């Protein structure tokens, strides 16, 4: 699968992180396999969780293919980027097509990023998890890697005014 869009997006994201003055503490990146399919099951506390987790996978030389709600793919700016980075659109009313697409990607050796809570937790506590990540792992015979993000809620989350001016925010993945 050709990745023409992912590399320049990574450059832009890294510049954005530098502009924000974010301090990263990536722990356990040795658990991200350098080859073969796997699932990152990620808590969801902020709108930047996907980019933070994707950044954490880069030392393993891997791109994460995230499952994201269809509405993001319908956005005029985000949609082409999401498709170009081979992320997987999830229609919440009919998830079978996205399940099949994720299964196919896992069997092809891709890392899939899933937010099992299904949405951002406004309490910043882990909500009840949906079963899709485990069902995909069983179907593809791949490991599930539990992944926690902390700190992104200080930058941009639900029901809180976005503050991209905050500097030196510590982020742990």
Language model: regions and residue ranges:
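Helix-to-loop junction immediately C-terminal to a conserved catalytic motif
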Residues: 5-7, 12-44
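Short, basic, glycine/proline-bearing loop/turn elements
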Residues: 13-14, 83-89, 116-120
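Catalytic core of membrane glycerolipid acyltransferases/transacylases, capturing the structured
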Residues: 33-94
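Hydrophobic/aromatic ligand-binding patch that stacks against planar heteroaromatic rings
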Residues: 56, 81, 104, 135-139
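Catalytic-site beta-strand/loop segments enriched in glycine and acidic/polar residues
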Residues: 105-134
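A cross-family acyltransferase "interaction/gating" segment
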Residues: 124-173
């Amino acid at each position: 699968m050709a990745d023409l869009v992912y590399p320049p997006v990574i450059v832009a994201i890294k510049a954005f992180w530098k502009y924000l003055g974010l301090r990263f503490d990536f722990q356990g990146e040795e658990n991200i396999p350098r080859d073969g399919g796997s699932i990152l099951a990620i808590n969801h506390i902020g709108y930047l969780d996907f980019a933070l987790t994707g950044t954490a996978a880069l030392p393993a030389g891997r791109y994460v293919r995230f499952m994201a709600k269809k509405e993001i793919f319908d956005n005029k700016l985000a949609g082409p980027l999401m498709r170009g980075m081979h992320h997987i659109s999830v229609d919440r009313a009919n998830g079978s097509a996205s399940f099949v697409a994720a299964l196919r990607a896992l069997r092809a050796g891709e890392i899939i990023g899933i937010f099992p809570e299904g949405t951002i937790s406004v309490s910043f506590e882990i909500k009840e998890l949906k079963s899709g990540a485990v069902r995909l792992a069983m179907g593809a015979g791949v490991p599930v890697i539990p992944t926690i993000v902390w700190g992104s809620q200080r930058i941009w989350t639900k029901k809180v005014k976005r503050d991209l001016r905050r500097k030196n925010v510590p982020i742990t993945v």
